[in-house]
Amino acid sequence: MSLLNFGKPKAMSPTTGLGGFLRGYSIEVMPRTAAKVTDFRALLPEGTRVYIAHIDGTPIEDMVATAKRLNADGFKVMPHFPARIIKDRATLADWIARYQ
């Protein structure tokens, strides 16, 4: 093993380059945006992690419905609720329970 490798450049493999960079990516959607997408399966590989953005003023019911839809389509759903919009522990407990 050498510290400086001045030999031939290594051949690109499926895990390097742009393909490797994009492998395992995640996205974030808002319920109102998700409502405009007919079929996420046509856009994203199965198993993609999809964060559900909690936007102040959007009802929790819309957030949970979006999460259920994406989960049913085979995506790994992750609710993303910022601490600043959670009023108290009871609200946090309620939101977590709704997602379970």
Residue ranges and their predicted role:
Residues 2-99:
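Alpha/beta catalytic barrel-like cores
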